[in-house]
Regions:
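Bacterial Sec-dependent N-terminal signal peptides
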Residues: 1-22, 467-469
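CBM-like carbohydrate-recognition segments
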Residues: 21-103, 117, 122-124, 129, ...
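Extended ligand-binding groove/face enriched in aromatic
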Residues: 124-128, 135-272, 388
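Extended ligand-binding clefts on enzyme/binding-domain cores
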Residues: 218-335, 342-353, 365-399, 403, ...
Length: 469
């Protein structure tokens, strides 16, 4: 038996050597190995405006159906059309997202920009319709609140804001649209929001927006975006007070940045407590996104010759360098930016993509250096948009902590509204970028060119005039 086994085994070993042809081995001599297709974890490479438009349309179609603009009886669900007779049973019809949250303020600004970039009127109509609806129903809910002492909590956020979260982002978006459409009846809402921001929001002794949580006299990096863009926009809305509001916006920005920016990291800390002898650096990604977005919003409004514009720009560019150095190989950024074992987060990534693309489009930063970063980031963000149009991988609302575990274990959820506006805004700005720059694959890498390259060769040089159209 052992003899037979050995004989058969010997035959099996010998047969392949006789029967099989010699295979060609891919090696350095016969193959340009540097052109082998890499095993990317996500999408990498070419991107078209049409492709981006399809992605943001999917998100738009989802939020459009999930944010109805109707008043209903909370007990019966019946739609109320006569607002003059409604009582405390009236509330906004509930969808997946709130119409007057700060997250939706970002969404409104994003859709205003998307309408400009794409010419798609649906985006503009979405914002117009909801702003007109809120302006129409707000006085009736105010009447109910005056008579009954209570009304829908979502309207109270508009009528009686108690934090910058309640006021700033929606106020800024309303001003943007009001400046484009003089018939938009939101002046009363704008004034109510802005009165809170400029006159009632808690501040440090030097006037910096602050909170008394989680500690007394705490600066939240988030509040840069929750307050400063609205003040900057007010300089365009109330032109008689333009200089006052520009000065206030710049003052707020620099007083936040001087305390919270960490030069050696090129990042912002999330929180700063006035009474603390040390100021820990937990560089939460989304808050850093709000800070970068605030700089963009402020620079958009500041005149080129404004005395402190260079200082704002210096902070912005230093922040861009710090953030882009920490992008993951998948294209997303980490929840705590400088801690690679924290999870990859979508909303912050989308904000960075918008800011980078916007800054390139404005000529503030270099397309060669940062265009590929933005494009990789967009590919990663687009990969987080599911078939229904929901945005996956977004951290839920987050407070402040001075330990890493808090940030590492924040849940993610498709109903975290923070992801939708940034994704729409990033997509709109990427479309603008792709329409003005000319990214092309060269030696397997994304490169950005100011002029369209004629060649389709996998590797090419650009030092000859005949490569350009």
């Amino acid at each position: 038996m052992n003899y037979r086994i050995i004989t058969v085994a010997a035959l099996l070993v010998a047969l392949p050597a006789v029967a099989q042809k010699k295979k060609t081995v891919v090696n350095d001599s016969n193959t340009p190995l540097h052109l082998l297709r890499p095993a990317y974890q996500g999408t990498y490479g070419d991107l078209s405006p049409e492709q981006v438009k399809k992605d943001i349309d999917r998100v738009f179609n989802y939020i459009d159906k999930e944010t109805p603009a109707r008043v209903v009886d909370k007990n019966t669900g019946k739609v109320i059309t006569d607002y003059t007779t409604m009582g405390d049973e009236a509330q906004l019809e509930r969808g997946a997202f709130r119409l007057a949250s700060y997250e939706w303020g970002v969404t409104y600004s994003a859709l205003i920009a998307a309408a400009e970039t794409t010419g798609d009127q649906r985006y503009a109509d979405y914002v117009q319709n909801r702003f007109r609806f809120l302006a129409e129903v707000a006085p009736h809910f105010k009447r109910v609140y005056t008579e009954k002492g209570k009304t829908d909590s979502q309207l109270l956020q508009i009528l009686t804001p108690h934090a910058l979260d309640d006021a700033g982002a929606v106020c800024a978006a309303m001003i943007k649209l009001r400046l484009k459409d003089q018939t938009l009846p939101v002046d009363g809402l704008i004034q109510n929001y802005f009165d809170f921001i400029i006159n009632k929001e808690y501040r440090l002794a030097d006037g910096t927006f602050a909170r008394n949580r989680p500690q007394r006299n705490t600066l939240w990096l988030d509040d840069m975006f929750m307050g400063i863009p609205a003040v900057a926009q007010m300089s365009c809305y109330d032109k008689e007070s333009k200089n006052r509001y520009l000065a206030e916006a710049v003052k707020q920005f620099l007083q936040f940045a001087d305390r919270m920016f960490i030069p050696e990291k090129g990042l912002y800390r999330h929180g700063w407590v006035e009474s603390s002898t040390d100021h820990p650096a937990f560089c939460w990604a989304r808050a850093n996104g709000w800070a970068m977005l605030t700089a963009c919003e402020l620079l958009d409004v500041l005149p080129e010759d404004y005395p402190q514009r260079p200082k704002v720009m210096d902070y912005f560019r230093a922040h861009v360098r710090g953030v882009t150095a920490l992008q993951s190989g998948e294209g997303l950024w980490h929840q705590l930016l400088d801690r690679n074992d924290s999870y990859l987060e979508t909303s912050a990534t989308a904000i960075y993509v918008y800011c980078l693309a916007h800054a390139i489009n404005k000529g503030w930063i270099d397309a060669i250096a940062y265009g590929p970063v933005a494009q990789l980031g967009w590919h990663a963000v687009a990969g987080k948009i599911n078939e229904e149009g929901q945005v996956e991988g977004t951290c839920v609302g987050t407070g402040m902590a001075f330990d890493p575990a808090f940030y590492y274990y924040r849940p993610v959820n498709v109903y975290a509204a923070h992801g939708y506006g940034p994704v729409l805004w990033a997509g709109a700005e990427m479309i603008r970028l792709l329409n003005t720059q000319h990214p092309q694959m060269n030696d397997s890498a994304v490169q950005y060119y100011q002029e369209k390259q004629k060649t389709t060769a996998p590797i090419f040089a650009v030092d000859k005039e005949d490569t350009k159209e």
